[in-house]
Structures are given as structure tokens and as C-alpha cells.
Amino acid sequence: MHNGGLIMDKIDINQTEPTVKRSRLFDIFFYLFQWTWGFSVNIVGGIAYLICTKILGYKHQKFGYANIVYMPWKQGGLSMGTFIFMRADHPNKEWTYNTRIHEYGHTWQCLLLGPYYYIVIAIPSMIWCNCFQKYREKNNVSYYKLYCESWANSWGEKFSQMKRIEK
């Protein structure tokens, strides 16, 4: 089956976690850097994760080096270091599949940018998402046109070794 330039039979839309296996040493360094260099982002995400999973009881899962919490909201996704918060039970499985990969890309951006994640990624992303929706619709501009969003897609695919389904 062919869709938008990608061969669909190579994509398992039901795949819920990357199958990438890295060395134990890599794992240690990943979390060491996330929780030192990226501390200011991960501490906020970690507190939100604990509240959402331990107090509110929201469903969650591991996704590569990240933890995804499925939220009862209508929005898309939000990444805070190794913590991803995204809409639960979206009716479109392709959206859920793509959003996991995209938000995972933001996890890796945090690893690179650390405390600069807020000014380079989070703030521009929130402004683009919340203030430019009508502009994007009127001018037929993809949400992923913004540098930090296309970068998240690219890195999400690279580090999960999962391909997004193109629209």
C-alpha cells in the first residue's frame, strides 16, 4: 500500500514503542545528561508526571527513553524532557502514532539544549500552536513548518527508528 510517498506496509501503526536497543553505558549517560544539563525541564515534567500518574491515575507507558502520560484533554502533545503528555484515546490511530514519534523528538532536543530548551523550543512551539492556528489554516501552512516542529519530527524518527505516516 502506498500513501504520500511512504510505503505503508513498512510502518506498523500499532507499534507503541521503539525497538532501538542501546548499550547500558549509553542509557546511563542519556539520563545523566537529561537530569543535569536538562534538569530545569525534567524537574517540571517529572513533577507533572508524578501528579498525573500517582495521584490522578492517568494511563502511562514507556516510549524509548521517555515516559508518555495519556491526558484527558483535546490538545495534542507536550514534552518536558523525558516526560511526554498527550491526548488519550484519540480516534485517529495515525495521529497517536505520529504524535508519539514527534514528541519523542522533543525529548532529544531537550538533551541537546538543556536549559535553553524553553527559549529555543518550548516557547516558540507554544506560540506557534496557540496563536497561529487561524493563520496556518487560512494559508494552508503545516504545523510542522516551524523549525522546532520539523526538527522534532526528524529527530523523533531518527532516535526511535520509527517512520511517521505522512499526510
Enumerate the language-model features and the residues they cover.
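Short pre-active-site segment immediately N-terminal to the catalytic Zn-binding motif
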Residues: 84-100
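N-terminal signal-anchor transmembrane helix
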Residues: 57-79, 90, 94
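Short, charged cytosolic
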Residues: 9-11, 78-88
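Active-site recognition of the HExxH zinc-binding catalytic motif
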Residues: 98-110
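Metalloprotease/metallohydrolase-associated module, dominated by Zn2+-dependent proteases
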Residues: 23-58, 68-74, 118-167
